[in-house]
Structures are given as structure tokens and as C-alpha cells.
Amino acid sequence: MTNILRPTNFEDVIGQEDVVKRLKINSAGCKISGSVMPHVLIDGPPGLGKTTISSAIANELQVDMYTCNAANLRSVKSILPYLMGISPRAVLFIDEIHRLPKLVEEFLYPVMEDFKMSISSGEETEEMELPQFTLVGATTSGGSLSQPFYDRFTIKEHLNFYSTDELAKLARLNAKKMGLTVSDRDLIEIAKRSKGTPRILNARLKWYQNYILSVGNDGIDAIFNTQGIDCFGMDVYDRLYIEVLEKNVGNPLGIKSISSLTGIAVETIENSIEPYLVREGYAVRTQKGRALGKTRRK
């Protein structure tokens, strides 16, 4: 399903227009000149298309793409196979790049700048030249990268949440790919329940399809109420988070306290729950902690 719905080039990407425009200019210029595209850092909440855009970069450049997750690169040794096997002008995509250990970050400094790496074997150190390539890093926490590492990315882009109209347009396109007929009204309602995030939209579409096929069309509210999704797109964890803040009005809570009270992992709160709720005004982050925002559930 992911492969069916994921765009393969910039022309097929819906939303993030300014980001896509700049990356198209960069990739087209590099392709014409035959030069290597500068290293790229893409920041933003989960599910907004960082992997999709990285893949589009490689496809636009017509080069190979190598993919890895920083969570699996716990030592210099673990990244060597990617570097030693990389082809000229290729894209090396590292997801969750903020998870790289400092030692691996520092090892990549000369790799990114000069395309050289030093490998120690016993008492000897061998310097190897690498083909020039583009490192594309994706992160939900750009501020977690060390400054020297951050500065080595020439191109830095931030992805924003999608509007309801953009998501409805994407829903129409993806529903067609899925062979699913959806009314314009339902497309809008699915988009409203997707928290500004394409990945969530695709999950909502799949649930909608399965419900229609197995139960029937009982109406959009019944379809998503069964899944525990309200008209704002909030699930049980979002509501639990808000309920904790409602019970502590005037008493901002630290994230660890919220985690303890809700049973939700800190990382899940930071990456999956708070970005949307803060953006929509349901919650605010203050120096003293998290507090209830001005937006209220109806």
C-alpha cells in the first residue's frame, strides 16, 4: 500500500509547495551542470513526507538511493557498508538522523566535506576517498543535531502540516489509486480527521475502505467513531493528554509527569501528540511546563 500511494517525483507531490520548488531548482541545476547536489536536511513532524521528498530528490537526479535509519547506526562500523558501497552522485538517506551517536556524527564530518574517511586497523590508519554523493537527513528534531553537524547541511528545509484542502486533494488522488469511490463530502471529512498529516490520511483512507467493504456505509461519523476518532481527528491518546491538562488548569505539567499520568511514552508525546495539539491551540508549551491552550473541544 505504501508503494502504491507514495509519489516518486516532485510533480506528484501535493503540498509543501515552497520546499518542493526550491528542491526542484537545486536538483535541476545540479543535473544540468553534472555536479553533486549539496547535502540536505529535512526537518518536521512525523508523517509529512520527508522520506517521499528524499526519494523524489534521487529520482529527479536519476541517481541511486541508499536508505538507512540512524537508530541502527550505533557505531562507525555500522555505517561503513553504506559508504564503501555508494555509487557516484548517489543519495544516502538517513532517517531519524538526530539519533546518530556523536562518534558517528564526527566521523561523517570529513566524509561530508571532502568525501574522505579514515579507517583504523590496529595501529594503522588508512584514508579512503569516496565518490561524491548527497547525504539527505530526515529528522523530527533538528535542534538535537550538534551545531557542527547541522552546519554541514547546505540545504535545510522544514515541512509544515498540511491544510484541509491539500489533504482532501491528496485523499482524492490516493482513493483513486486504491480503487475507492469517496464522495466530496467524505473526502473533506477524512481530511479534517487526519491532523494535517498525509501518513495519517492514508491510514484513515484504509480504515474507511475496510469499513465500507466489511460493514457498509453507515456515514462518516459512525465509520470513525468505531475507530475512536472524533471529528477533530483526535484519538484516545490525544484526548487522554488533553484530559490530564484539563484536570490541572493553572498547574503546568512537565512532560515526564504527563507521561506518568497517561502511560504514554515521552517520545510519543513529543513526536506524535504534541505537534498537532500545540499547532491547533489545544495545548501550549511554557517554561513551567505544558498547559491547556485557548482552543477547546466542543
List each model region and its residues:
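Dynamic helix-loop-helix/coil hinge segments at AAA+ ATPase domain boundaries and subdomain interfaces
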Residues: M1-R22, D230-F232
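Walker A/P-loop
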Residues: A28-A70, P81-P88
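Conserved AAA+/SF3 P-loop NTPase catalytic/coupling segment centered on the Walker-B
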Residues: A56-I57, V76, P88-S118, G142-R152
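AAA+/SF3 P-loop NTPase mechanochemical coupling elements
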Residues: S120-A138, F153
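Conserved AAA+ ATPase core "coupling" helix
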Residues: S144-M178, D184-K192, A203-R204
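Conserved C-terminal helix/linker of AAA+ ATPases
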Residues: L187, N202-L205, Q209-C231, D238, ...
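C-terminal helical "lid" of AAA+/P-loop NTPase domains
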Residues: I188-R193, R199-S214, I242, S257, ...
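Terminal-proximal interaction/regulatory segments of ATP-powered molecular machines
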Residues: E246-K298
